[in-house]
């Protein structure tokens, strides 16, 4: 039976799968509650900077480890993306049951943003949610990849799905300007450092699902998409491809000094405050007054 087990830091999902769970509580009953969904190779710790900041301001966060990551079942194995969306629906329902009178928000980071976008844009969007934030969402689907790379990936996943891939040593990807945070992240045993080709195929597929679902995001739920101009993990090409498909009710914020890990960058508090303002009032101006993401003509 689905359940939140705070004593053992776990969330029991719809099929009995045990998922790791971290909760950042507030001193008093929260007016706003966040369900946090982390990105690729990460786990609930992705919220270790944002959640305490929000908790001090009355926002409680429940961040779970998606299956295949962190403390959850199937670590290192790629789960079916339908299961990932169902885990999100389950987490939302469980948190809503614990806080029926609070404003309920989903904050999805990178791959977690793609999972959230594909879930809310599906034929069965999660119920009971009042806000959604896509933080540096994973929007690097099949349509952004050169044809020769697509063919190579499709072939590899069928011929050798367990093949472990590593980026060349000369390829240096900086997901954040917060170097101390990155050093701790790289040494965290709950993070994943290498991926099988099936995992690469899987994450590209869920990002493509998010792109295709974007036009169907429900107008009944206020949404905010945030993106950093210095994000080289999810290139702006992928963002623009999806941004022009977003419905008019989706707001966006483009941070000139932001990297991929917006919620862990050196300027993270700027983003924390913007997200907090949006959670409190979806129509309110963002404190940073940054402009919309490129290619997005909505608000």
Positions of predicted regions on the chain:
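Catalytic nucleophile-loop/oxyanion-hole region of alpha/beta-hydrolase
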Residues: 41-44, 70-103
